[in-house]
Amino acid sequence: MSNLITEITSEQLRTDHPDFRPGDTLSIHVKVVEGTRERIQVFEGVVIKRRGSGISETFTARKISYGVGVERTFPLHSPKIDKIEVKRYGKVRRAKLYYLRSLRGKKARIKEIRR
């Protein structure tokens, strides 16, 4: 039974996404439907967590919009995601960056590394 599930889901896995980790700053291009029109909306933020594996893998990105923190969770293999671009690679020592929620201003910065 599990072989059947992995066989079906392996066809739907996307391989066109770049390699990214928590702490990296991403630009996620999402297809948004408004009425009858479909457009691309860009969400740029820091990855604070990745969870799951296979077809059910998700990641959460956080950004500050007009002084308010906004977090959005995306399914990694969703057809609604047009493309993902890595803007900065961050150096962090945790897999889940929930502590960024309580930090403001310069304390919320993440050290950048060159890859």
UniProtKB/Swiss-Prot annotation:
GO terms for cellular component: cytosolic large ribosomal subunit. The keyword Ribonucleoprotein applies. The keyword Ribosomal protein applies. GO terms for molecular function: structural constituent of ribosome. Keywords: Ribonucleoprotein, Ribosomal protein. GO terms for biological process: translation. Belongs to the bacterial ribosomal protein bL19 family. This protein is located at the 30S-50S ribosomal subunit interface and may play a role in the structure and function of the aminoacyl-tRNA binding site. This is Large ribosomal subunit protein bL19. The lineage of its organism: Bacteria, Bacillati, Bacillota, Bacilli, Bacillales. The gene is rplS.
